[in-house]
Amino acid sequence: TAVFRLTVILKQPVKIKPLRKAVLQAEKCFPFFRVQLRKGFFWYYLEHLPKHFPVEFDEQRFCRKFPKGSLLIRILVKDNSISLECSHILTDGTGAFEFLKTILILYSEECGAEIPAKYQINNADSWVSEEKYEDAYNRYFKTDIPPMVKRSKAFHLPYSLKSNPRFTWQYAIIPLEEIKKAAQIKGVSITVYLVSVYLFVLQEIYENLNGFSRYKKRKKLRIQVPVNLRNIFPSKTMRNFSLFVMPEIDLRLGHYMFDEIVKSVYHQMKLETDEKLINKNISRNVGSERKLFVRGIPLFLKSLILRLKYYSLGTSQYSGVLTNLGKIDLPNETAGLIDYFVMTPPPPNKMLKICCGVAGFDRKLTLSFGNSTHSQEFEEKFLEFLSDQNIPVEQKISK
């Protein structure tokens, strides 16, 4: 599915009545999220649906798809956890987190906390502006931009898939200061450091394959890293406004030491987040939608073509995904109720098999791993590497 999950673990059990009130208040500030996906003759489209966001007991499998005729967000509760599951059709991680953040602030207020004025929502109508639901891709689209260069196919993990439902999930908690210190020693950000660990572990798995298996596998290791474009192009949109960079190493050039990977990833990510190169990416995404012959293709044919393109031009080009929720900013009165956050990306497809989400809050950073295979070798090696760097790792039970 294209459903991702944001989870907040509170220090105390969730109070259902205050939470329901908070969700009802928050949805007034996000009316553009109260929509369902509809099928037209040429395109899918979003249509307003006058329903309230469901607050349900968290007992079913993670990131399951939304049924037809339903809203594309659900709120799930269990013990001391609140989870928001959202379809990527509706928004990206930043947009979904803004909604969850609003719920948490209102929840803490309902529980008796006094919220600073700058975080208060006294008038939902004044909070909603056209910029909140603008199509920012179209706003920053430029014509006559040269196309992106097609990338070669990448290495994929060799593990066998489980039978359905195959998606399992586990996470680990790491002291934020320790991982930050390790990254600072290398002169890079936490994201660059973790992407480098990801590539280093993939390299080790590749090198441990037997000769014939290694011969058959692609030698490009490449990680897809989503980028919040609001940090590059000014926008307050709550709709999707993210693209990705794909740092890589090429094992045809030989074995990479970890420091070599860090250096390479740092410079590749700097280059690929340059505004001009991001414009090429936006041009590719938006430009195809504007072509008359594309607009005139019936939806059933578009869906067939996109499904084929998804594998040939999509997941075949990268080996894994690492998405970092970024800095989490909350008023102290709300933050005091919270232990930590967990970010779970959409379940990986049959080709990718594993994905990784990162969330840092207060003194804790969580690493979550989604897995659709029989093996946990990747997660074990990833966390073992961090432990070898003297970074304490507290592993949580998988589900």
Please describe what each predicted stretch is.
Residues T1-K39, L49-R74, Y171, E204-K399:
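Acyl-thioester-dependent acyl-group transfer interface
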Residues P67-E109, Q120-E130, A359-F378:
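Histidine-centered acyl-transfer/condensation active-site motif
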Residues H88, A183-T191:
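Alpha-helical hinge/cap motifs
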Residues L90-E98, T102-K181, L386-K399:
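Non-catalytic, low-complexity flexible loops and terminal extensions
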Residues T91, L104-C111, Q184, Y198-N210, ...:
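Hydrophobic/aromatic-lined pockets within catalytic cores
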Residues I190-L199:
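Short amphipathic alpha-helical segments
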